[in-house]
């Protein structure tokens, strides 16, 4: 982009400028320097003259208003005629290239007094886009002092091309202030300020481009005059030749035009081809493919194989992008054989530029009904013929600049003989917008995406094509769900760094046999209104979800315990974070006021990670550690009043499915559980994924008469507590037995009639050691 610069002399302290020049003039002894110094001091009535916009680094759009100040420092009284400022845009094409590092030719000024005008071609590769002029000061005498003149001007509301400056031309927007004095020598004094303008291109309005379909048909070789036929195994992977039968052969009309001796791999339905394969680009895969087969059969000497057609379909999912975006591309191939190529697909983003030194538009303004006058490309000869020349110079030039490139593998499934490739290419961050709105298309810049597919899979065999794979940029690849699967390109730095030298030239590859190429035009814009709307909606929905989740985390609905959970098969409730194999009861959601005295019942640890809840209020480190420990433990089963017992004593008993003896959970070596009235007590176990009420054969459904106390914390939890916070052992379980008798969850208790059968997860006595957890 073009930076804003000021062409006038800027001086903050005018006195220091004069004192710094006086020693230099005293050191010079030449007569010429003395005259030059005297002439210079005569014109030093105005020392500083510059334009200062309020926002000098801003990029403007058509219709925007630009405000600023014209500063004028007068050291001697001076008379002026007027002081004006003009805002204008100009397009200029240079005749020769400007080497890098050299100053381009001056755009020049059209001079004051032209007023407000529109686009106009001035000839010789110069055209104006618009002009607007405002008078800041009239005729008068300016005394010593610093003068600041405020101005406010606006760009035209119609579309304008973006600012750009390159080696063959420029599109510039400038603020030019001109001071006119009533003298004959140097009557005007002017200064300029370059303004950066961007064309307002909204990419949300561009529809996705139509997919391009390439059909590759095998065509048999034409028989020679001597009647010799080629062997069937010749070029078997690429051609399919059929010998005509003796009884019914295909005759060819004699009035057909002669074939060209030069082989060609591009042919259409109306031309002949000597190559073994030909392809045509169609828009409708169904109708055009069939018509292409019929045309190929009618124009060939021998019938072609209809089932040997190779179809490649390329899709660019977006027609407009912004600088720095990623453009997704989808390629679908229906092949006749299995092909594996690590670099079978080459995608290149390039910029095509076109400049015209003599556009075919009339010179001057034709608003008054004047006859249009066109510029001659070349001087007229004596015969009166114009536009004839024997030289090699051209009025227009077209050039291409490759910006980024990515490779994708081509692997055809041997079962279905199809390949679906999803890849992408990144737009460089410093790419300027598409430019097409200059008068007469004097300067045009368009962007294209070229997709080259090697259908034979032999692109990697010649080393002259791909000598340096590690220097070629690799774009982002997308999985089937649309997510990026290439971790090396997450920052996108490898894409924009590979410019020019490290990009493979595909001109020679496109000429190879079995290689097809399609081109899509994409528009690089400056804004996307649809993306802004979606981001605003997403932010509003996120804020609403946060407001909805805040009261839910602190309170529990009364019907929460009545929901039925079946492990991972149950979906998460709206507004809750998804948890795996976990259901929180009311006691788990309401965190205790004193975390040191835990009142929760801990169950055997089950694998799976749970998201850590965010603390609702500031807490000390010990409380935060205990809360983190509680998130690692499984939850209590919900209390279902329909499935559980009706008595209050039975409601205090935890329930769990009884697992058989041969289950792998017996390897955990739980200690025998306590017996109540000769029956084995039960401890909470893993919840079944099929049903909460799992009945084992041979068990009884009679409930226990007395409730058992809650199970103690397992050894793993105690070790974690000792290592992390050196906490003491939990309180006496017998003291909490009577207080917590009615607060436990309720569910039917199942036990085995046989006294010898042990249940998994039984509660241990207070004086016994806790069961040891072993993997």
From Swiss-Prot:
Q: What GO molecular-function term can you cite, just one?
A: protein-macromolecule adaptor activity
Q: Where is the composition biased (Low complexity)?
A: 262-278
**Pfam families in alphabetical order:** Arrestin_C, Arrestin_N
Q: Which residues cross the membrane?
A: none
- The Polar residues compositionally biased stretches are 279-304, 697-709
Q: Which GO terms describe its cellular component?
A: cytoplasm; cytosol; plasma membrane
Q: Which GO terms describe its biological process?
A: cellular response to pH; penicillin biosynthetic process; positive regulation of penicillin biosynthetic process; regulation of secondary metabolite biosynthetic process; ubiquitin-dependent endocytosis
Q: What does this protein do?
A: Required for the proteolytic cleavage of the transcription factor pacC in response to alkaline ambient pH.
This protein is called: pH-response regulator protein palF/RIM8
Species annotation: Emericella nidulans (strain FGSC A4 / ATCC 38163 / CBS 112.46 / NRRL 194 / M139) (Aspergillus nidulans)
Q: What is the lineage of its organism?
A: Eukaryota, Fungi, Dikarya, Ascomycota, Pezizomycotina
